[in-house]
Amino acid sequence: LFDGMNTVVSQFAHLPHGICSQNSQLNIRGVLDSYGIGDLFKSVVGYDDVSNGHQKPHPFGGVKCVENIFGVDQANELCLMYIGDHEADTQFARNIEAALGKNAKVIAVAAGYSRSEPENWQTKPDYIANHVDDLLTIIGKYT
């Protein structure tokens, strides 16, 4: 976990959390549990939960994560935030929004604090968090 992320997750504990990652579900849950925040994540979708043809940036895993948290009926009426450190994550967020359709909105946040360079990406995020603390302000705009 990036330094300060525990604070961000805890401050917004009242919001439903999920993870969709190219890591394995077991590894993700192990890290979350080691920081004492595993119970805050209602859904964790790892690469091992998604078939090879449906890996990111295909929206399948993201939609599965959202539906696990909110149910199928509510999934297309939500405002969601997806935070990622690769350009493919921003494309993934756009693909989830398109797959959910209707009134769903997925806000893409690039984790610039991970030494990525989102200002050079072709697929632009809605926000760039250059420091973990920036997430407090970005998420706060929508709560």
Please report, for each region that a protein language model flagged, where it lies by residue:
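CheY-like receiver
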Residues: 8-11, 65-68, 138-142
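Structural recognition of alpha->loop->beta junctions
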Residues: 37-48, 116-140
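Alpha-helix N-cap/helix-start and coil->helix boundary motif
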Residues: 6, 24-26, 38, 87, ...
